[in-house]
Swiss-Prot record:
GO terms for molecular function: D-cysteine desulfhydrase activity. This is Putative D-cysteine desulfhydrase 2, mitochondrial. It comes from Oryza sativa subsp. japonica (Rice). Catalyzes the production of hydrogen sulfide (H2S) from cysteine. The keyword Lyase applies.
Length: 407
């Protein structure tokens, strides 16, 4: 493993923090696929003017040379393959958090999300795996036919539905539900309230035997401890031989809560890497994302106490690490535009990689634009998973899912 640049100085580094952390995932390893961007030979109008080839999995022709030679390309970090049901950045954000909660004596976990929330489903699955009872609050009404992530949440967790008016006050809703779960003799704790010492010390949780200890995880796992799993991913990528020769690395990720983007940027800073992180804003305004970034960085500094400045050394550039950008076709969150499902189908058929039009397609389009515009930079897209969301989309946009004859 390559030593981090700050390690040579003898100070405490992020590597020390990561090595002292218990993880949910057995390994940070993930597949990285190389995608070649080709001019399209088919007639569809822009923006569908590219074709794609997966150079990692496609058979090599002509001794490995062909029309892909010299074409723009980018890397896709296949975190969608981490787990059959609960993968992507949803698993990364729980990587350090769930073992910590179990060690702290958590018996139950409460979180929330939309009806097809990948985060809620991931929390339900992984909590069940780790012996904690998951309680999931989903926005809206129960669908007539449970499918996709809604079905996964129902199978692994204890699901309740909240009206949109109640859901609008998330913190109050989560706390009230957690109090009901805890009962008269139980305790309720927010995940963000667990201090840095909890990462290195086993403590008596002070609960009565048999009582419930309920921990609340924010919507989308936007908690400071979620950053560590993402930073662990950055360290893993940094140590891959394919990344060694590239000083200029540009990482692209779609942003829901923005936590993953901040974790990627913090990981790069703490490891002394001159990586750029661009996040495609999908669910909020630029001002809100910047506020969340500032808050997460502040919480991370508190988590590390006096060790934060030793970790980042001269690399600290304040509270603005992420480049937040609009999606190429901005829209109200959750809306799918004409042609986007067809584009996801095209990409799946040409590369074997399934994207969803609400999240990962936005990151893919950004990565394509960057690699076409700058061949000197290694462009890396983080696949954040979420592909089971297609099950819900197929119900909402049934006319877009047809068995057209393939040519």
């Amino acid at each position: 493993m390559r030593p981090s640049p700050a390690l040579a100085g003898g100070g405490r580094t992020v590597a020390n923090l990561l090595s002292a952390t218990e993880w949910m995932l057995p390994s940070p390893a993930t597949q990285v696929h190389t995608i070649s961007v080709l001019p399209s030979h088919s007639p569809p109008s822009p923006p569908h003017h590219f074709a794609f080839s997966n150079l990692t999995t496609a058979p090599k022709r002509n001794g490995g040379k062909g029309e892909e030679e010299g074409r723009p390309r980018f890397e896709v970090v296949r975190d969608d393959l981490l787990h059959p049901l609960a993968n992507g950045n949803k698993a990364r954000k729980l990587d350090a958090l769930l073992p910590l909660l179990r060690r702290r004596g958590a018996t139950d976990v409460v979180t929330c999300g939309g009806c097809q929330s990948a985060h809620a489903a991931a929390t339900a699955v992984h909590c069940a795996e780790w012996g904690m009872r998951p309680h999931i609050l989903l926005r809206g009404e129960q669908p007539d036919i449970p499918t996709g992530y809604n079905l996964i949440s129902l199978m692994f967790g204890n699901v309740a539905y909240a009206s949109r008016s109640v859901y609008a006050h998330r913190d109050e809703m989560l706390y009230n539900h957690a109090r009901k779960v805890a009962g008269t003799g139980g305790t309720v704790l927010w995940a963000d309230d667990i201090s840095k010492e909890d990462f290195v010390l086993d403590e008596d949780n002070g609960c009565e035997i048999g009582s419930r200890r309920v921990v609340i995880i924010k919507e989308g796992a936007g908690d400071v401890q979620a950053l560590l799993g993402v930073i662990r991913l950055v360290e893993y990528l940094y140590n891959l031989s394919s990344f060694h020769k590239h000083e200029n690395v540009h990482v692209v990720v779609d942003a829901g809560t923005g936590t993953t983007a901040v974790g990627l940027a913090l990981g790069a800073v703490c490891l002394g890497l001159h990586w750029r992180v661009t996040a495609v804003m999908l669910a909020d305004t630029l001002e809100r994302y910047k506020e969340r970034e500032k808050s997460l960085i502040s919480d991370f500094k508190k988590l590390c106490h006096n060790n934060y400045h030793e970790m980042v050394g001269e690399n600290d550039i304040g509270d603005s690490l992420v480049e937040w950008v609009e999606r190429f076709s901005p829209r109200r969150f959750g809306k799918v535009l004409n042609g986007e499902i067809a584009l996801c189908r095209q990409i799946a058929q040409q590369t074997g990689i399934l994207l969803d039009p609400m999240y990962t397609l936005a990151g893919w389009e950004q990565a394509v634009d960057l690699c076409v515009g700058d061949s000197r930079t290694k462009v890396v897209m983080i696949h954040t998973g979420g592909t089971l969301g297609f099950c819900g989309l197929a119900q909402r946009y049934s006319s877009h899912f047809t068995s057209d004859e393939q040519t």
